[in-house]
Regions:
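Short, surface-exposed loop/turn segments at beta-strand-coil junctions that are enriched for proline
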Residues: 574, 588-594
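Short acidic, flexible loop segments centered on an aromatic residue
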Residues: 550-563, 603-604
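Conserved beta-strand hairpin/beta-sheet module of binuclear metal-dependent hydrolase folds
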Residues: 1-39, 134-152, 252-308, 418-437
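Active-site HxH/HxHxD metal-binding segment of metal-dependent hydrolases
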Residues: 31-115, 289-291, 297-396
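Accessory terminal helices/loops
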Residues: 160-161, 165-269, 277, 463-555, ...
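Short proline/glycine- and polar residue-rich coil/turn motifs
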Residues: 573-581
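Metallo-beta-lactamase
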Residues: 24, 114, 119-208, 212-216, ...
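Terminal connector regions
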Residues: 592-628
């Protein structure tokens, strides 16, 4: 029997109404009021979900019908509160989740593997989500594929952040490629995505898109992986020792010049600059802070040994290259045992002090894993990190006899700072994690490109990094995770070429005219907060970013789980090109709620386009048995 297929504009997603064998089936479910109006009383037997991201199922708690989901999507949707309790611990990349489920429990969720959905067939197609599912239907001699977020019209990818399953290894994209090729073998004629028009010539379009996306994923790989020689980029002893450095007589420490030391182990460097007055300062501060960091001596013991060997009477401060916790792990020891201050760039100061407010990967609490791996980040036992001095772009400051320039140096992340100084006759730039030494002229040596780092290439990422370094023209780059790069200009130019190519590829795959929206998971995002024990409420900030070259209008509201209320939670703001705006909303528990983790989302329209509850964060309610160890 032939099916009748109707496309319903569900607001934040397409929903498809299939009438067949006397039964009405929906694929995905949009905004409830629009859906009910479009359905006009039709008797729906079940809803088949392609994935569990909110824009396809956020309002299903209002719809009393059987909901069918497969694999991990079922696991998430069948226990929403269980997912949120483990926020940042499951389906995450260095602590940043890559699934975006609803904040309220949908009704009647059934496990797809236990259901008969004939005459449709379900095909597992992970990538856009862990168990993304495509549904096939043969009708009237045509094979339809309901493809969810797998591919959009014009050979576009819905976004990058949902595919960011790891930190630079591109497994989410490679899984998407596998799914595209699997679906190609099913030979569909027409593809019906969840947020674009239909795609005709489905089999051919899938094959072309799979090849393009495979090339893109390989292009995005961190360059030490793409070159196929990880050791060459990471093994600090293999090239530097005897060439640019000599052993300092302490395990894991090299002397680069009379007044510059490097501690290196397990792919990470910290630098010690010695001053004329026998004091010293550090650039970054980790050497052996967590399990797996190698066999260096205990950190404080090592620093004391170096102080005696080099006549250092005081460690003044630590200059931080970027916010990632692996560059900060031993700072608490530096403060407690040596009195060293922490100096950071202005756009990372709050992230360092209040990491739980942000959905960035690799914040310091992430590294409190080991024996505490089952703990919420809010329960970390790591001490609070206080910033002593905030540096601005272009600021020149002195530490004893050394003059140092701090400058915004994004790349791997927007929240990066470079430090430039002349030392022992050389002009040095300390560059953090933005670039790796690469003798291979075919690659740039770029580090990870992760959109969750906030790293749009032109102003927040690798293009700005390359152009700042090109203008600076240092003799050497002192890198966070690789060899020293001597005479670095050829490699800086290769990094610039990579960044320009990256922008073109982002434009190629973006379903929006301005690629920045596609690669920015922070353009309308709430921030996490804590409701302290004995309190009933807190202020939740929502940050808006206009990535357009023209004004953009943002309309929306805060969405909360049951038991919470936000007074005057709506907003309507127009931002000029490149504008930024932070809004604050007071959220209150209507009655005492159990201690734990609770989600908060922002329901967003931009220039009249309905995006739904796109981005999220969490509120931590402290109480008996649950207290944040990393408080404000």
């Amino acid at each position: 029997m032939d099916a009748e297929i109707k496309t319903i504009d569900g607001g934040f997603c397409n929903s498809y109404l299939i009438g067949i064998n006397g039964e009405n089936i929906l694929v995905d479910y949009g905004r409830h009021d629009k859906m009910q109006k479009a359905l006009n009383g039709a008797d729906i037997s079940r809803v088949l979900l392609t994935h569990a991201h909110r824009e396809n199922c956020a309002d299903l708690w209002l719809f009393d019908r059987e909901i069918v989901a497969f694999g991990d999507e079922y696991g998430i949707l069948s226990d929403i509160s269980g997912y949120w309790k483990k926020y940042g611990l499951v389906y995450e990349s260095l602590g940043t989740p890559y699934v975006r489920p609803p904040i309220r429990q949908p009704s009647k969720v059934s496990k797809g593997e236990n259901c008969s959905i004939a005459p449709l067939a379900a095909i597992g197609a992970p990538g856009h989500s862990p168990s993304h599912t495509v549904y096939l239907l043969d009708s009237g001699g045509v094979r339809y594929a309901f493809t969810g977020g797998l591919i959009y019209q014009g050979g576009k990818l819905p976004n990058l952040y949902d595919c960011e399953w790891d930190y630079g290894y591109m497994n989410g994209l490679f899984e998407t490629v596998k799914s595209l090729r699997l679906l190609t073998a099913c030979k569909p004629d027409i593809l019906l995505p969840d947020r674009s028009g239909p795609i005709l010539g489905g089999t051919g379009e899938l094959a072309k898109f799979a090849d393009r996306l495979d090339d893109f994923a390989h292009f995005l790989l961190r360059d030490y992986m793409a070159s196929g020689n990880e050791t060459q980029s990471f093994d600090s002893k293999s090239i530097d020792s005897g060439f640019l450095t000599k052993p300092a007589g302490v395990e894991g420490v090299d002397e680069i010049s009379p007044n510059l030391l490097r501690v290196h182990k397990n792919y990470s460097n910290l630098y010690i600059v010695i001053c004329e007055d026998h004091t010293a300062f550090l650039v970054d501060c980790w050497a052996n802070g967590y399990s797996g960091s190698g066999n260096l001596p205990p950190f404080s013991e090592m620093m004391e040994t170096l102080a005696k060997r080099y006549g250092i009477i005081k460690y003044r401060c630590v200059l931080l290259s970027h916010y990632h916790g692996d560059h900060l792990l031993n700072y608490d020891e530096m403060r407690k045992n040596f009195g060293a201050e922490l100096w950071v760039y202005e756009n990372m100061a709050d992230v360092v002090e209040n990491p739980f407010c942000y959905k960035f990967p690799a914040t310091l609490p992430y590294y409190d894993r080991g024996e505490n791996s089952g703990m919420s980040f809010f329960e970390t036992k790591m001490p609070h990190t206080a910033v002593d001095r905030v540096l601005s772009d272009g600021e020149i400051f002195a530490i004893a006899n050394h003059e140092i320039k701090a400058f915004h140096l994004p790349g791997q992340t927007d929240m990066g700072c470079g430090f430039y100084m002349e030392l022992d006759g050389l002009r040095l730039a300390f560059t953090g994690d933005n670039i790796y030494y690469s003798p291979n002229e075919a690659v740039s040596g770029h580090d990870c490109f992760a959109v969750n780092n906030r790293a749009l290439p032109e102003k927040e990422g690798y293009l700005k990094c390359a152009r700042v370094l090109k203008e600076l023209g240092p003799d050497r780059l002192m890198c966070g995770h690789s060899h020293i790069i001597d005479k670095p200009m050829p490699q800086i130019l290769r990094l610039e070429r990579f960044a320009l190519d990256l922008i073109e590829k982002l434009r190629e795959f973006s379903p929006e005219t301005e690629y920045e929206w596609y690669a920015d998971p922070f353009w309308a995002t709430p921030e996490g907060q804590i409701i302290a024990k004995g309190e009933r409420g807190c202020f939740v900030r929502v940050k808006l970013r206009n990535n357009s070259e023209s004004p953009a209008r943002f309309q929306g509201c805060i969405c909360l789980p049951e038991g919470f209320r936000c007074f005057e939670n709506g907003f309507d703001a127009t931002l000029q090109a490149g504008g930024r705006l932070t809004l604050a909303f007071y959220v209150r528990a209507e009655k005492p709620v159990p201690p734990g983790i609770y989600p908060v989302t922002a329901d967003i329209r931009r220039d009249g386009v309905d995006f739904g509850e796109l981005f999220d964060h969490v509120i931590c309610v402290e109480g008996a048995g649950f207290k944040s160890g990393y408080g404000l």
